[in-house]
Amino acid sequence: MSHASRRRWRRATTSAATAALLCGALLTFPSAPAAAQVRLGSGSYTTVLPPGASGPSDHTGAPVAPKVTADFTQPVVTNDWWSSLIFQRYPGNPYGENLYAHPLSFKAQAHGLEVGYPDTPELVADGLKYQYTHSPDFVLGIHGLNAPAAKVAGYSDWTVTADLSDGTRQLRTTIGQGLPFVYADVSGGPIRVEFTAPPTVWRRSGNAVGVTVNGHHYALFAPSGTTWSESDTVFTADVGGSGYASVALLPSPDDFDRYAPYAYSFVTSTTLTYDYDPASATLTSTYRVTTEAREGTAQGTLLALYPHQWKETTTALTDLSYASPRGPMRVVEGDRFTTELTTHGILPSLPTVDSADHQRLRALIDAELHASDPWKGASDTYWTGKALGRLAQLVPIADSIGYTAGRDALLDLLKNKMEDWLTADGPGDNAQFYYDDQWDTLIGFPASFGSNTELNDHDFHYGYFITAAATIARYDRSWISEERWGPMVTTVLRDANNPDRDDERFPWLRSFSPYAGHGWASGHAGFASGNNQESSSEAMHFAASAALLGSLIGDEELRDLGVYLHTTQASAMRRYWQNADGDAFPAGYSHDVVGMVWSDGGDHRIWWDGTPEELYGINYLPITAGSLYLGHDPEHAAAMHQSLVTRLGRQPQVWRDIHWAHQALSDPDAALAAFEAQWQSYEPESGSSKAHTYQWLSTLAEFGTVDTSVTADTPHYAVFRDGDRRTYVAFNPTGQPLTVTFSDGTTLTVPPGQLATG
């Protein structure tokens, strides 16, 4: 059974305990399309589900609709930390799974919202997984509430408002990542807090109570003029016909008075904005909260930051902190905080060095180009995507060695396949995209890995299509024009990560969780452990492809989206998948790397019964020039490679090319030597080719490792160092000559559409 088959099987069996685009302006997407096909330039998609195909479904295969309230008006979000509230994966569970917002965790139930603080890790599965499991300290509800289901009433960038109603009583709670508060609006009865153990009350201040339960400290705040009635494990506050309350998680009882001023400053919205400044090679991200004072005049709140945020923030930190599966969270005070990251460039390809054997490169390109099936039997969005990516990487190599006929033949292959997929030709079309206006998503058929039924992995799949489109655009700008294939390409891109908040066809950043700093793969998050992300590198591949495409078509919004995603995820990936700072994994966890990040922890396993090489490699592939982030710290890259070798007791034998490419980011000479000894006998990983691996290794053997101490005033550059010698590379996506200035004073003049090296 192939690794794909194993991956598909485990995903399928693991259970849980138009707006048409481009042409300069958006058109109104009809709520009930008059025709099955919606044309965008030369391309089209269908609004009718292909015969025999399935859209979003529950675990039994029955179609499901988003679980939202009657007053919900936003695009439907999937692939987030709270998605099990909106996507009912299991027919017997209308309330959703555990929700890990950090520092708090939650689970909706008929009588209210469970609230807990998972601050103690446990090791499970023979120590392969660490997890901070949700265990409720109390249920926040209304006296007599018996809601048949939980629904989503609204959301913002990292919060969600959950609705529990039974026709007489209604509880709406707003919860969010980094929020130590729970905000509740109630009607139909008294607010009710039922603890899971008798609490210790250490503070009574009329409408506010401080308690400790299960070793965790909370402050309960009801409206002024009300009091809390206490009866063993049940506390109630009569707020009349309707009212509000908040609950705060306190680091210690001594912090009661630091949280009380914000008890009635209810968070109503959260917003992430980012600004990329090429001149300074800086990405500035600002996280804002909007609050409403239910009493008093207080504004802002207290926010707990993940390590990738507080270690890069320019905002003053307090001395308050919490535990989380990502490491210690630090607290800021106010209505916003800002992070700053250095951008280290995204290249479309590496240069080919003169020392490489160009005749061998040509022969290896021909082996791919003239294979009996260059697509290797691919038919669905994932495997077709990987084949597109493999062939796309060969185009600039062929061009760099003067093999123009090979380059053009490869481009023809890419164009024909892309045009087939980007055109919906009716019921018999075996390669097309379908827009689901109920779920606000674009699904490619044939689908795979639950990209249709579970809305999994859209950025993983579609990133390959965007790479192919960017490669074509690099050599044929007319192909990507608004009159031809550009509108359909950018529609595919925007399904996965839409930067335009006014484009109601798709949610903003479906495949990226801005507070978490990375994406979530599962559309429904229907797991007791929350959501998960396995292949961080395929998410990074999408980001790189978006940045390159945006630059090539002159769309700064898409370019900056790609830069934001790539830079932010690189910061999170090294910390949460590879524990680069040493404080993400808990004490006693014996592994150097996890194959998957879960909402509740990390797992040294993957979705199929793979080898150690695959566990490490699924977070490296596909290897492209956008993968240089894996070598931003060559010592850390070397440690990761040695970690795998130590575990194996030998050099990698599976996906050897992926691991040679990764090894080359710290020891390119050794990686090239290994390739030279085995290049005629090894089997390439399905998304890789011998030509690309050889070119990658030979270039890095000459250039050295990535040098992040030097930046440039363009999104598309890299600097390498071999001893005292630096090599500078830049790409010019425009139609005019471009002078790139590096931070050490070096300049490169780059011809239109070309790479330059100095």
Curated annotation (Swiss-Prot):
Q: Where is the GH81 domain?
A: 38-704
Reaction catalysis annotation: Hydrolysis of (1->3)-beta-D-glucosidic linkages in (1->3)-beta-D-glucans
Q: What is the effect of changing residue 538 to D?
A: Decreases enzyme activity
Q: Where is this region: beta-sandwich subdomain?
A: 38-251
Active site located where? Answer: 457, 534, 538
Q: Name one Pfam family in it.
A: Glyco_hydro81C
Record function comment: Cleaves internal linkages in 1,3-beta-glucan. May contribute to biomass degradation by hydrolyzing the 1,3-beta-linked plant polymer callose that is present in decomposing plant tissue.
**Protein's UniProt name:** Glucan endo-1,3-beta-D-glucosidase
Classification of source organism? Bacteria, Bacillati, Actinomycetota, Actinomycetes, Streptosporangiales
Q: Which gene encodes it?
A: Lam81A
